[in-house]
From Swiss-Prot:
Naturally occurring in which organism (per UniProt): Tamandua tetradactyla
Family: Belongs to the complex I subunit 1 family.
Membrane disposition: Multi-pass membrane protein
Stated role: Core subunit of the mitochondrial membrane respiratory chain NADH dehydrogenase (Complex I) that is believed to belong to the minimal assembly required for catalysis. Complex I functions in the transfer of electrons from NADH to the respiratory chain. The immediate electron acceptor for the enzyme is believed to be ubiquinone.
UniProt gene name: MT-ND1
Molecular function via GO: NADH dehydrogenase (ubiquinone) activity
Protein name as catalogued: NADH-ubiquinone oxidoreductase chain 1
């Protein structure tokens, strides 16, 4: 029975990832005054399935000098971790009910760094290794601010439980009192998922394709799926933290529809940003975090710690 529950969670996510690739290609196409994929199926709707068949039926080549085990383990680990992160998300019911749901998500997203590092190192290619090192430095750096922002939000809700966050936001979305945190969180999630304008790991001009340069066929598809699963996961988490997730007092039945709609709007913003902005320079990326975001988030954390204490309204601790 539990396996059926897992399948009911994973299959829709995989389908959503497939169509997200199509939406992205269509969006970029129309923003660049062209059509995008429109041959396979009506209006190109079957393009993701054609891509999947093509990738998974090709021969998975690997470099002769690569580390065989790590080379194959890395993409599998990437997708496994990307899908595991969805388990504690209330939509409106989660697969597993965790008291420390947010901490679990943060820990799993930290582990995802290893799949990137292993893939770059196991490929035995200097392009892949430089791309992997960039990705690790970027991800680890931005996780610092993500963790501090999470802590500030948790001080408002008083619990690590994700369902408590929804209860906290019944009267007001947290994006209103904590809008500077929300802005920094959104930009940090862009960097965390290696998306434009922070996609330095796959800088075509200098790194060919980044850490996955030596991958082809199935393993490449797994990395691709993991990236899009992480994008949707981060947007779902943003919805839970700042946009009140599902609660509409007049229509409580529209829980899941609300949640999905807000997540899709944030995902569309990700695609819009990709179509609009050029890539950052690497030193600018690090400067933005360590010299701008980190001091501001620390100041906001002190503010969120001192405010409840000064007003004698410490949030309920569960």
């Amino acid at each position: 029975m539990f396996m059926i529950n897992i399948a009911c969670l994973i299959v829709p996510i995989l389908l959503a990832m497939a169509f997200l690739t199509l939406v992205e290609r269509k969006t970029l196409g129309y923003m660049q005054l062209r059509k995008g994929p429109n041959i396979v199926g009506p209006h190109g709707l079957l393009q993701p399935f054609a891509d999947a068949v093509k990738l998974f039926t090709k021969e998975p080549l690997r470099p002769l000098t690569s580390s065989k085990l790590l080379f194959m383990v890395a993409p599998t680990l990437a997708l496994t971790l990307a899908l595991t992160m969805w388990a504690p998300l209330p939509m409106p019911y989660s697969l597993i009910s965790l008291n420390l749901g947010l901490l679990f998500i943060l820990a799993i997203s930290s582990l995802a760094v290893y799949s990137i590092l292993w893939s770059g190192w196991a490929s035995n290619s200097k392009y892949a290794l430089i791309g992997a090192i960039r990705a690790v430095a970027q991800t680890v750096s931005y996780e610092v601010t993500l963790a501090i922002i999470l802590l500030s939000i948790l001080l408002m809700s008083g619990s690590f439980t994700l369902t408590n966050l929804i209860t906290t936001q019944e009267q007001m979305w947290l994006i209103i009192p904590a809008w500077p945190l929300a802005m920094m969180w959104f930009i940090s999630t862009l960097a965390e998922t290696n998306r434009a304008p922070f996609d330095l790991t796959e800088g075509e001009s200098e790194l060919v394709s980044g850490f996955n340069v030596e991958y082809a066929a199935g393993p490449f598809a797994l990395f691709f799926l993991a990236e899009y699963a992480n994008i949707m996961m981060m947007n779902a988490l943003t919805t839970l933290l700042f946009l009140g997730a599902h609660h509409t007092p007049l229509v409580p039945e529209a829980y899941t529809a609300n949640f999905v709609l807000k997540t899709l709007m944030l995902t569309a913003t990700f695609l819009w940003i990709r179509a609009s902005y050029p890539r950052f320079r690497y030193d600018q990326l690090m400067h933005l975090l360590w010299k701008n975001f980190l001091p501001i988030t620390l100041a906001m954390l002190m503010w969120h710690v001192s405010l409840p204490m000064s007003l004698a309204s410490i949030p309920p601790q569960t």
